[in-house]
């Protein structure tokens, strides 16, 4: 704070001693004011620290109460407790991760994904948050995204056998099943398209009836020009009526016998 100094007005005569006296008093007052300002700022800072400590302690208490309520099956009340705790400590990733688990338990999948995403944003190295996010994404049907979340969690903590054996392997099996189902569906659609391309003929139309009649007449004429010849041995031979002679093996044998 700037020190107050006596300023001589124009036309006035002030002795040097009086002027120095006022300046000394002003300097003393400025020192007192500065010390009061320091005490006031320190008090404000201490008050903020106390409030912050109170918020952290209260948030921890609400978190624990919410956990007990969730274990007792009172999910809605647990969510209320955790929402209050989030208002006090919005940077606590564990609160969002616990909230995501309970939201999945009450089948609110999309809010669960949002809560888990917030958890990994607050703490990107939180393995359980990535695991919960992957499970929520699986429940939403986003298998590829879930596999990515599980892989990130394993990259952070490769020793997490549960994440590897249960979550990631299960997600990969679901992905293979989805691919097989999609492949079968594509084949079925291709068969339907092929069937649609085959024209549906009207077999009772005049053109088809006329063609069938012509084929029938041609077959009758061909049959009429054939003659059945029965040999002595009982075998039958077909020959055209236009031929004058019919020679068989049996007749040759008959002539030789005579």
Swiss-Prot record:
First and last residues of every TPR repeat? 59-92, 93-126, 127-160
Q: Where is this region: Disordered?
A: 231-258
Enumerate composition-biased segments (Basic and acidic residues). Answer: 238-258
Identify the keywords attached in UniProt to this record, alphabetized: Repeat, TPR repeat
Q: List the disulfide bonds.
A: none
Q: Which SUPFAM superfamilies match?
A: TPR-like
- Asked if the Swiss-Prot or TrEMBL record annotates the protein with the keyword Repeat, the reply is yes
List the PANTHER family: OSMOSIS RESPONSIVE FACTOR, TETRATRICOPEPTIDE REPEAT PROTEIN 33
- Protein's recorded name: Tetratricopeptide repeat protein 33
Organism, scientific name: Xenopus laevis
Q: Which gene encodes it?
A: ttc33
